[in-house]
């Protein structure tokens, strides 16, 4: 595998990267929810049919975890120091068994750190999309990134 090293200076505003995919199945939804979010809509197919969703849906935290898994396929890991936070988190549509999810990352802002000269702060608009192109999750992700050595 070729290793790509991406640092703060390499981030070009307006660039969009699309990575995926992740197929969600019933066992995935139920096993995650049994441990972390045991609501009937996530763990009981019969009870879920009686809800406004009409069937099983993935937990919001599960959806965010899938986003995180897909984000690790964007070659920025060598440059990442830490997460700075998530803003404007929105769940637009439910994630259901059989959905195939993709992550779209668009770099929307960057600035040098005011207090640490070896790093910068990058903001990305994250969109998790299903197989129909529908956005199921969106948010802004603030990422603290290393500058290349010697800068």
Annotate the PLM regions.
Residues 52-59, 71, 90-98, 129:
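Short amphipathic alpha-helical patches
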Residues 1-84, 150-151:
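Hot-dog-fold acyl-thioester-processing enzymes
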Residues 2-13, 91-100, 104-151:
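HotDog/MaoC-like acyl-thioester-processing domains
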């Amino acid at each position: 595998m070729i290793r790509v090293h991406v640092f703060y200076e390499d981030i070009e505003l307006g660039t969009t990267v699309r990575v995926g995919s992740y197929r969600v199945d019933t066992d995935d939804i139920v096993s995650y929810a049994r441990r972390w979010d045991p609501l009937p809509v996530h763990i009981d197919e019969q009870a879920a049919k009686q809800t406004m969703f009409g069937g099983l849906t993935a937990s919001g935290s599960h959806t965010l975890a899938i986003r995180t898994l897909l984000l690790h396929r964007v070659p920025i890991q060598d440059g990442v120091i830490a997460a700075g936070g998530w803003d404007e988190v929105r769940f637009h549509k439910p994630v259901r068994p059989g959905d195939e999810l993709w992550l779209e990352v668009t770099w929307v802002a960057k600035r040098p750190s005011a207090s640490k000269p070896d790093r910068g702060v990058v903001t990305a608009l994250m969109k998790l999309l299903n197989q129909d192109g529908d956005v199921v999750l969106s948010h802004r992700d603030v990422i603290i990134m290393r500058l290349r050595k010697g800068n």
